Amino acid sequence: MCIRDRRSTQYDSNRSGFYWNDHIRAEQNAISDFEFDKKTAKALLEQGIGLVNTHIKDGVVRGTGALIALDLNGDEGTRILSNKSGQYLSLSRSIQSRQTYPTSIMGSMALLRQLYYDADWYEKGNIKNTDLTLEAFNQNTNLTQIFAAGSRANAIRADKVGDQFDIQYTILGGGDEFERIEAIKNTNATFIIPINFPKPYDVEDPFLADRLELESMREWNQRPANLSALENNEVPFAITMQGLKSPKSFKTNILSAIEQGLSKSEALKALTTVPAQILKNDKVGNLKKGSFANFMITSGDFFESNATVLEHWVRGSRHIFEDLTQKDIRGTYSFIAENDSLILEINGSKHKPLSLIHI
């Protein structure tokens, strides 16, 4: 039996006092829905992440984001570094609205262009009624404009919209920029690049292997080299963990990118100074006088697989993961137990030793 969906098509906005299209939500502020999760924050700190920039991922225009310090010992007053860290845009509809338009990427681009014209008209006082969306949109134009493109094709499309209105977007890419690297470079944009690389395919099953497409294999093979391609072509970028299912994959995937040619110095910049520049915040991403005391103490070179985070300081607040005062007991020891001579061998790491007794 088939049950017909009797919901009528929605053409107009169902919000009063806001923009005529519900997929434009410039009045949203991420800080309004912010809740600090200590468990998640601790997991991020252990992986070397001390600050998080977040926003509401919903709509063609998504409102403002928030920059949060992951201080487990502080409160909201010290954790919130910026309650308006940027204005966020995309080509995706809002899940909060059933309004029909736009129905395609091209429709989203047309809607965005119309928004810029309407915002300019509104700012010049040509509209008597108050529009809370346009007011918020105009107020946020002095912030960094971050466009969630999600692919190299959409990045180029977004840049064309920005060029039309003399706006240089910072573009959240899709990790496939290497496929159109010249066009990506010509955008003159700073990119935010995800490192959610595809996992290896299981080719032991001949049936599944036969169905595996060459394009998918190429993507799996080449995506870790994307950051190296950006570096070699002098495209500025920051690294994001967006799209990763586990914080533990963050460093693992960075090391994969380094194996594929990304320099350690560029990786460090992509995690520190470049994000700070994107967010126009000179108190983070560096250790200069007057900046926040944000730094890590590690067991070795952070970009080595066996290096661990021993301590993570956020705004001068200390978070200890492994005790620096712990003595190194690794070595080989001989002792006698019940008249038997035994050898005790302790190896492993200093903070996680492993023991083996030889009889």
Question: Which stretches of residues belong to each language-model region?
Answer:
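Conserved small/polar residues in nucleotide/adenosyl-binding loops
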Residues: 1-5, 357-359
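Metal-associated gating/positioning segment near the N- to mid-region
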Residues: 4-55
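Short, charged, surface-exposed secondary-structure boundary motifs
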Residues: 7, 180-183, 200-207, 308
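His/Asp/Glu-enriched, well-ordered alpha-helical/loop segment
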Residues: 15-19, 25-27, 144, 190-298
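Polyanionic/metal-chelating signatures
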Residues: 36-178, 282, 302, 308, ...
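Glycine-enriched alpha-helix->loop->beta-strand junction motifs that scaffold or abut catalytic
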Residues: 162-168, 186-192, 236
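C-terminal cap of metal-dependent C-N hydrolases
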Residues: 292-325
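Tryptophan-anchored aromatic micro-motifs
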Residues: 325-343, 351-356
